[in-house]
């Protein structure tokens, strides 16, 4: 039996029944990872994983710990003690952290078993899975390797969709977990800003960054938040808010109100997506929910991408100033200290990263701050106010997670058409407003998945999972992986 395609709950039940054990499961996962052709791995931790699995078997099962012995992969922008962490950038080659990220510490305490590090777009900047220093990461649902899996959490999505592990860690700054989840038939979740500690997560845009993860069903996503949520004094932005038992949600939408945004839901072009999206709304209403179309100022929707882009370029320029070849990572020789920095950054960053840093530096120059950076901050505030106004009257915002199936690599372009930018980038609402947001599979088109997204009120993750579980029951697309029945 192939145990690695099972969910966390299913695998745990087999452990309890004595039908398999972590040693067997880890060996299966390692064998599948070695055979995988999707270029999803940055570094492996197989020896340590085998030792940990054997230790767990010798110690005996913890029946009340559902994460006991569950293998997973880590996006390579999380610090892993003693394991190279490059964030898929040449400039960080050779950097080996001396500490684990807080989320990894918590998962280790729960006896989950890390198998290795997953690929990403360089420094988590990008949405294609194309810009990492190891090249393209492929979508497991396309054996021809023509379709992208999305990014920046490309490898993390690919490894779960390929049926190698039940879950993986990612990070979400614009839609870097939730968009790949749509393309790969997965549940992709980001919590409220501050709900999960970011200690040990390499920063991209701190005012937008969130730890996220991929699972194959909604319950597993809620289960992980039970462990990962909560205050961490090492991360001063982590919240003191009380942690709920998220996996105890009741899958019910009776009396709940869903808003669809007119400027987005009315622009759906893909006929399969449109059909299934409308059907899901009808089914939600049958189950007692209210679903209504709401209008947000189109000018604010049109400003979503540009606002995100200006802010993210500016913050990332500042955050990555320490990558200078002096403190850690790769270093290029130079006659002077300035030459070392210049040569290191020139050789270490790709053209995409350099462009972002140039734009970020430009927007932060004193003479440009009011025109660009401050204006983007003001636009963000207006967007957040408009979204929160909607969520005052409604419990959730319900929208397609992507315009259609994963694009082909040769279709990737810098399409600056306003309608396209809104349709393709509206998930940044969750980051700009710091709201919990979840993507789950909605339909299959030409053998490729398309997801739907639900965004809720801040710190209302439990009800978000409850609503997502109902949508999951409507679509019937639970526990998807390549080769599963669709």
What do these predicted ranges mean?
Residues 1-96, 101, 123-126, 237-240, ...:
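Short, well-ordered alpha-helical
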Residues 18, 29, 69, 109, ...:
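Glycine-rich, small-residue loops and helix-cap segments
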Residues 9-12, 27-30, 50, 54, ...:
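Predominant activation on well-ordered alpha-helical scaffold segments within soluble catalytic domains
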Residues 49, 75, 107, 221, ...:
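Conserved hydrophobic/aromatic pocket- or pore-lining residues that grip, position, or stack substrates
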Residues 6, 44, 147, 154, ...:
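Residue-level signal for the nucleotide or nucleotide-sugar donor/cofactor binding architecture
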Residues 162, 166-168, 173-267, 278-287, ...:
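Structural helix-boundary/capping segments
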Residues 35, 68-211, 261-263, 314, ...:
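Short glycine/serine-rich loop/turn segments
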Residues 19, 33, 111-115, 228-232, ...:
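A generic secondary-structure signal for well-formed alpha-helical elements
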């Amino acid at each position: 039996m192939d145990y690695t395609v099972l969910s966390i709950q299913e695998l745990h039940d087999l452990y309890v029944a004595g039908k398999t054990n972590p040693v067997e499961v880890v060996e299966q996962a390692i064998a599948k990872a070695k055979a995988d052709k999707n270029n999803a791995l940055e570094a492996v931790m197989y020896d340590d994983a085998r030792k940990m699995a054997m230790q767990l078997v010798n110690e005996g099962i913890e029946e009340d710990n559902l994460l006991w012995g569950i293998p997973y992969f880590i996006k390579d922008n999380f610090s892993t003690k003693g394991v190279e962490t490059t964030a898929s950038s040449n400039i960080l080659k050779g950097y080996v952290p001396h500490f684990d990220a807080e989320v990894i510490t918590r998962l280790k305490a729960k006896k989950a078993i890390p198998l290795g590090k997953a690929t990403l777009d360089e420094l988590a900047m990008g949405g294609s899975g194309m810009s990492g220093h190891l090249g393209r990461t492929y979508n497991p649902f396309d054996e021809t390797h023509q379709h992208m899996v999305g990014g920046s959490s490309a490898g993390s999505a690919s490894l779960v969709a390929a049926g190698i592990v039940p879950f993986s860690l990612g990070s979400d700054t614009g839609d870097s977990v939730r968009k790949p989840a749509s393309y790969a038939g997965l549940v992709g979740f980001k919590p409220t800003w501050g709900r999960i500690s970011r200690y040990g997560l390499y920063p991209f845009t701190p005012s937008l960054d969130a730890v996220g993860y991929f699972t194959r069903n909604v319950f597993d996503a809620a289960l992980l938040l039970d462990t990962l949520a909560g205050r961490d004094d090492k991360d001063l932005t982590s919240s003191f808010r009380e942690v709920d038992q998220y996996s105890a949600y009741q899958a019910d939408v009776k009396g709940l109100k869903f808003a669809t945004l007119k400027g987005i839901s009315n622009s759906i072009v893909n006929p399969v997506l449109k059909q299934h999206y409308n059907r899901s709304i009808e089914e939600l209403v049958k189950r007692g929910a209210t679903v209504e179309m709401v209008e947000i100022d189109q000018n604010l929707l049109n400003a979503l991408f540009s606002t995100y882009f200006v802010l993210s370029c500016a913050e990332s320029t500042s955050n990555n100033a320490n990558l200078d070849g002096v403190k850690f990572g790769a270093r290029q020789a130079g006659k002077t200290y300035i030459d070392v920095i210049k040569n290191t950054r020139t050789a270490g960053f790709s053209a995409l990263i350099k462009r972002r840093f140039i734009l970020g530096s430009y927007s932060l120059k004193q003479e440009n701050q009011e025109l660009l950076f401050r204006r983007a901050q003001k636009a963000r505030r207006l967007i957040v106010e408009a979204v929160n106004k909607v969520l005052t009257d409604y419990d959730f915002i319900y929208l397609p997670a992507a315009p259609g199936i994963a694009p082909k690599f040769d279709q990737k372009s810098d399409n600056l058409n306003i309608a396209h930018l809104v349709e393709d980038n509206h998930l940044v609402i969750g980051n700009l407003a710091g709201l919990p947001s979840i993507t789950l599979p909605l339909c299959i088109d030409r053998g490729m998945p398309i997801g739907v997204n639900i965004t809720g009120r801040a710190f209302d993750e439990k009800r978000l999972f409850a609503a997502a579980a109902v949508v999951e029951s409507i679509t019937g697309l639970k526990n998807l992986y390549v080769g599963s029945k669709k």
